[in-house]
Amino acid sequence: MAQVPAVGSPFGAECREMWRVPKGYKQVGVDLSGIELRCLGHYLNDQEWMDELLKGDIHWFNAQSFGLVEKGTTKDDNNPEHKKARNTTKTLTYGVLYGAGAAKAGSIVGGNSSKGKKLIDSFINNTPGLSALKKKISRLMAKGHLPALDGRRVWVRSEHAALNTLLQSAGAIIAKQWLIESTKLLQEKEIDAKLLAFVHDETQWEVREDQAEEAARLIEQAATKAGEALKFRCPVNAEGKVGDNWKQTH
């Protein structure tokens, strides 16, 4: 399921239109909003960073942390260089969080590993709490594992992959708790719903047509409840769509 191409990819729309619901029902798709960066926000535990994530423009904030634009620069939406810096930052941010090394980071901006190292070092040093988090992870790695969001042990193959593993595990735990909370709310309200797919940070449901909009709102509410249940420091939100097939609901 996770390998089905996205709507914008070749044959993606046609593939996703094949997942549909019977007459009298609607398909409800709900996605967690920016869960990877919210997981980072939880572990950074820095109010300034979380405010930028939730109320500001975290990618512009990170562009300054990487040194792609000067600190304190006000974003101009009509400036093509600002737009380019912001788009590059999105790629860099997720690349670094997913374990990209200096060579990969450098290639993203058309440079070499030396340039990539400067970018990564700048991001670590200018992101509030990130340097301290990485040092804490290094200390914990002496045991060969990290404590996950819910207390379980997460075994890590190398220190290079430690931050990524910690964030991925947190996202997976949040998503599973979200599914539990969604099921509870749907059952409490006696919603006629069946789970069709649970893919990464997305759920797809078959819901009786007259209950579809209510189901979408309940599943969105369940995301917040999941974060609260796990004492997640960064609010968890979700966005739902109602349609007739997977193309329309994701």
What are these regions (language model features)?
Residues 1-78, 85, 137-202, 217-226:
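Acidic, glycine-rich two-metal-ion catalytic cores of nucleic acid-processing enzymes
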Residues 98-134:
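Extended, well-ordered alpha-helical scaffold/bundle regions in very large, multi-domain proteins
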Residues 30-33, 95, 108, 168, ...:
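Generic beta-strand/beta-sheet core signal
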Residues 104-105, 176, 238:
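Helix-rich, typically C-terminal accessory recognition domains appended to large enzymatic cores
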Residues 43, 80-99:
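Amphipathic, charged-and-aliphatic alpha-helical interface segments
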Residues 125-135, 210-250:
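Polymerase palm active-site segment centered on the conserved acidic dipeptide of motif C
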Residues 58, 110, 121-124, 136-145, ...:
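A glycine-rich phosphate-binding loop feature that marks nucleotide/adenosyl-phosphate handling sites
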Residues 40, 101-114, 203-219:
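Catalytic palm subdomain of template-directed nucleic-acid polymerases
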